Amino acid sequence: DQYDYPELTANFEDATYDWANMPYQIDKNSPQEQIEAVALLGYHAGVSVEMMYDDDGTGSGAFSVDVPYALYNHFDYASCNFKPRTVSSQVWDSYIMEALEMRRPIFYAGTSKEGGGHAFVCDGYDENGLFHYNYGWSGSGDGYFASTAIDYPNDVGAIFDIMPKEVHKNTSEAPKHFEVVPAENNALSAKLSWK
């Protein structure tokens, strides 16, 4: 027998998220207010990308390309883009490093060799240049890996520019018409100017 599940909805406009009660990790022994705070955000995140919940665990039916729209329209984040990996590993790794240096977590997605897809988070790096991937699943499989050695190496894509609208609005643009003029006497100095 198949059960017809009701359509899931959320009132994003009136939602208030209790960020103070969202620790890095929770479990069944966590205080109820923490469980409820994390559950509400997780539920709204799923609804925002039209995730399909089922009792057989075969997948979510959600698409990573829907995440930027959800972040912008439902969670007050600045416009961002899902970027498929179409560049060399060196360039891709530089994108990762830049985002992490700016303290921005990276939404990551890919498919396994068997074809199953998964979305996860890249949230750090170590002194060896390996990146920390959080796959979910209560920490199972998390660890530091080269970007080419992750569990979902095919059809890789990521969102590097995730930030709240308020932060984006207050972030200055890079200088335009930037010019570097070396000092005349071969000194180790330069004059920087921009308009």
Predicted segment positions?
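Short linear, low-complexity motifs centered on an aromatic residue
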Residues: 67-68, 72-74, 85, 92-97, ...
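Generic structural motif
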Residues: 80-84, 157-158, 178-180
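Cys-His-centered catalytic/binding microenvironment captured across papain-like cysteine peptidases
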Residues: 101, 114-116, 125-172
